[in-house]
Amino acid sequence: LPEGVCVDVVPVGEANWAARPYGFNDLFKGALSDVSTLFMGKPILTWAMERGITLGGNEDIQNAPLFPICQTVDELGKVLRWMITEPDREEGKFIWLSARKLSANDLSDQANLRRLVAQREVFRKKDWSLLAANHEKSVFYQLDLSDAAESFAKDKIVLPKALPEDNPLMKRIHNHMFRSQVMKILGEAYKEEEQKAFALLREGLVSSVLGSKQQPCLNVYRDQIVWGRSPVRIDLAGGWTDTPPYCLYAGGNVVNVAIELNGQPPLQVYIKPSDTHKIILRSIDLGAMEVISSWDELRDYNKVGSPFSIPKAALALAGFVPEFSAEAYASLDVQLEAFGSGLEITLLAAIPAGSGLGTSSILAATVLGAISDFCGLAWDKNEIGNRTLILEQLLTTGGGWQDQYGGVLHGLKLLQTNEGFNQNPLVRWLPEYLFTDPEYRPCHLLYYTGITRTAKDILSEIVRGMFLNSEAHLGILSEMKAHALDMYEAIQCGDFVTYGKWVGKTWEQNKALDSGTNPAAVEAIISKIQAYALGYKLPGAGG
């Protein structure tokens, strides 16, 4: 086809087709006798003259019978070639002259819509496979893959194969999650494909750390203790936009605030040298202890619910396992001997589990910061925040960056990132007037409901929607990202009423993204206070 020329084949009656070529930029209005009236991008008078035919009078082109009805595909091919590129093709001219012809208006009235829909379904079924196979030049992996998966499952279309390693990482992630979704709809085993997608995401995030391996060195005297403390955080707007993979291809905007409880940072870590070449882990609030004497014991960090998953993964990232270490050692015992001591790490989380205040991520950041000081690694707060994101990938809990940066960076702020695997946020500090002024300070209440959920369960379903380019998920996330800027503006202006209403809007967005956010027990609490509050929300991924 020449550039700018399109072809439409319209079903007419029970067995015939109308051949309808046209120009992409044709206005399809104007008299046939007017030189400015275009057909396939050229004056229709010129088109008719080139083909030795005469078109009648001053009739508008919209009403002109130009489109022949054909009985076979062979006729369609011949007449279309004559109409578009081969004006001297006599057999095409004969078909056009002898056929019954319809105008554009006639086609609108006489098209067989049932056949048209069926025809489009057949084409669509074939096109899905072609789009997937031609992914290098097609938009397949940019489409709403959750919708595409429904079509693949319904029509039993053969799944696209797993993409080889030379393809872009994000495209391979989309590929595995798409395959997983089709299998899930068909009732087949899908978890393996799903886990491959999550594993590739971890690979992309962890690869940045593998390039800069660590050499921990004892940085304290034997009678010294490193003491790390952090507040927790409350997210006010934009939560979820910080979560991979969404933030990797769209960036994220989050407004949150660091808070202490009862005047104290509730998350604390103590590290001191040990006389034995072992790593001793203790948790004050859980009353647990574990002694680690091998790399395999240290690598056992990806069990959700383990009391010491976080310090184990943090020690791994600090270079206490071979894959993250700049030096080679025969064993952990030998490494600790070269280090100069063992380590005793004590954790205290003076806050209920599953509170939604970012406890696990901020505790991880606090542990990483304390280890950095103890081992002379000199990580700044940006590096600690980034390594916390990676640590959570190692734990397979996933999660974004707003929790750790919300706690490690003081006060009230807007955090923003751009797309890409480097998710170090730009920080825009906000005035704390609405939180500290005597007129507004008593208007804030942090209330513990006693209802908990593991963020991993919530994350996995929403992240699955992100991987699949789900229009429902991505649309809400885009609104959340814009809403964070509205919240930033309201706080900047010291507008308490608008700020309160925007907190309420954040809650509505969270419910739209995750219907399980508002169980009956939470709704019962809300029903008692909603008439007296400008806004309310559960913090985090459901509180």
Task: Describe every region a protein language model picked out.
Residues S355-L377:
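DPxDG-like acidic metal-binding loop motif
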Residues I292-R299, S341-A353:
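Glycine/charged-rich beta-loop-alpha catalytic/anionic-binding loops adjacent to active sites
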Residues C6-P11, N16-A18, L32-E337, N386-T397, ...:
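C-terminal nucleotide
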Residues I351-S355, L534-Y536:
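Short pre-catalytic strand/loop immediately N-terminal to key active-site residues, enriched for Gly-Thr
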